Amino acid sequence: MSTVDLIRHVKLSTARLPLTVPISDAKVFTGRQKPMTEVVFLFAEITTEQGHSGIGFSYSKRAGGPAQYAHAKEVAEGIIGEDPNDIGKIYTKLLWAGASVGRSGVATQALAAIDIALYDLKAKRAGLPLAKLLGSYRDSVQTYNTSGGFLNATLDEVKARATQSIEEGIGGIKIKVGLPDSKEDLRRVAGIREHIGPDVPLMVDANQQWDRATALRMGRQLEEFNLIWIEEPLDAYDFEGHAHLAQALDTPIATGEMLASVAEHKGLI
């Protein structure tokens, strides 16, 4: 009698989370996107023949939510009967099932919910937190508020949010930059640095909206604020520009979150 547990069912669902206040980053000020008013989630729940289950999710902002759900729905049935331990094999199977629409972007974002659900299932069945299942090293990590200051918020509002984050034990603050007036960006960064002091980690995020010349100029002007990193100063696919910028500045450059495939990350690295 076989003891191999197989996938019996994949349940997909979607939900919209409306934001209390629309939020804006630099893409709004360049006219490339509208303010974000909601986040759309894709949930995947995988159940096995022996009754084990795992839950995963992915999400989209501004656009793509219905497409993620549709893509996942179209390919998910293909993993029924597979061994849930074969996570890499299953991911490759799903990737090729929808390869005609590409192996990045919406396609891989849709698969993320299923992939995460498989890892969740494996950890639950082992009776371990996922971190330990993967081979844990630390028992704590330093956190930061990635939404510390969108551009629709006033400087006073950003300061208040920073104070709240620090009081709650969050170890760093990231704020948005990329306003049409770069002097206003610098004023806001200076105001936050003065408010939180020199020792609290501070980062900025331009959301891909600077060109190379602007990124270099702003990067040099921002160095006095001892930033942990400057995030997405350039278009995510400008790999060469990021490399030149990283060599020219003392402040580290962070990027990569908009890349959704192994090939794209290989190109960046």
Predicted features, each with a name:
Residues S2-Q50, I55-S60:
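Structured beta-strand/loop patches that form or line metal/cofactor-binding pockets in enzymes
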Residues I7, G51, V75, I114, ...:
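Conserved, mostly hydrophobic/aromatic
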Residues H9, T47-R125:
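Metal- or metallocofactor-binding catalytic centers and their adjacent structured scaffolds
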Residues I87, L130-L133, W229-A236:
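Flexible, glycine/charged-enriched surface loops at secondary-structure junctions
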Residues P129-L151, H195-D199, Q247-L249:
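N-terminal small/glycine-rich loop or linker at the start of catalytic domains
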Residues V141-E157, V177, A206-D211, A254:
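Active-site mouth loops of central-metabolism enzymes
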Residues Q164-K176:
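Catalytic domains of carbohydrate-active enzymes, especially glycoside hydrolases
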Residues I175-I269:
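Catalytic core of soluble alpha/beta enzymes
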